[in-house]
């Protein structure tokens, strides 16, 4: 049906030009499985963020024989990312030390700065974090598209014979007419 056709189109498009995806919750079993599947099927180039030893241990325990790319804040220098975060947020009161601390201990900030600097094309997060705290770093670091004044969440529901896009059931509480109009416009563009 339409659901299967939609997924085939999306997967084929992804496989034709695999993107680097930072998985912020890189030590989570589901994220490691997702990284394996993304890499195995050529859908994307996953980059797991977190403790490399823990990620390797979990992957082995799951019987996954792959060596994912890992950015481990405890084993790698993240100075360039801290510098960039400081540049972006210093006028909002963040110190250089706080920027270093954020990229070293909060993989949502690390992944967001990686995307902002072009070291990743996208970031996947929100599985184990409280939604607002998972959304805050990307909004602070990456922001919204140039033609967007508001961020919004979109869910894609696939049924046997149809596909439904549910826009902004997660971000804007009690949106006014302007927010609804913009979210509707951008969701329609996404659906096309």
What is the predicted role of each segment?
Residues 1-192:
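Anion-binding alpha/beta catalytic cores of soluble intermediary-metabolism enzymes, centered on
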């Amino acid at each position: 049906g339409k659901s299967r056709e939609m997924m085939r189109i999306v997967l084929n498009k992804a496989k034709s030009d695999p993107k680097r995806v930072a998985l912020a919750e890189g030590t989570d079993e589901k994220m490691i499985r997702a990284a394996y599947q993304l890499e195995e099927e050529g859908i994307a180039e996953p980059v797991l963020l977190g403790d490399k030893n823990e990620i390797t241990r979990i992957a082995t325990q799951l019987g996954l024989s792959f060596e994912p790319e890992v950015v481990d804040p405890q084993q790698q220098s993240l100075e360039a990312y801290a510098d960039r975060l400081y540049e972006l947020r210093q006028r909002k009161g963040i110190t250089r030390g706080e920027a270093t601390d954020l990229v070293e201990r909060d993989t949502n900030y690390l992944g967001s700065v990686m995307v902002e600097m072009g070291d990743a094309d996208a970031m996947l997060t929100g599985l184990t974090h409280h939604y607002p705290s998972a959304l805050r770093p990307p909004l602070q670091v990456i922001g919204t598209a140039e033609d967007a004044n508001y961020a919004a969440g979109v869910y894609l529901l696939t049924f046997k014979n149809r596909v439904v896009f549910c826009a902004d059931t997660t971000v804007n509480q009690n949106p006014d007419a302007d927010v609804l109009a913009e979210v509707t416009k951008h969701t329609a563009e996404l659906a096309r």
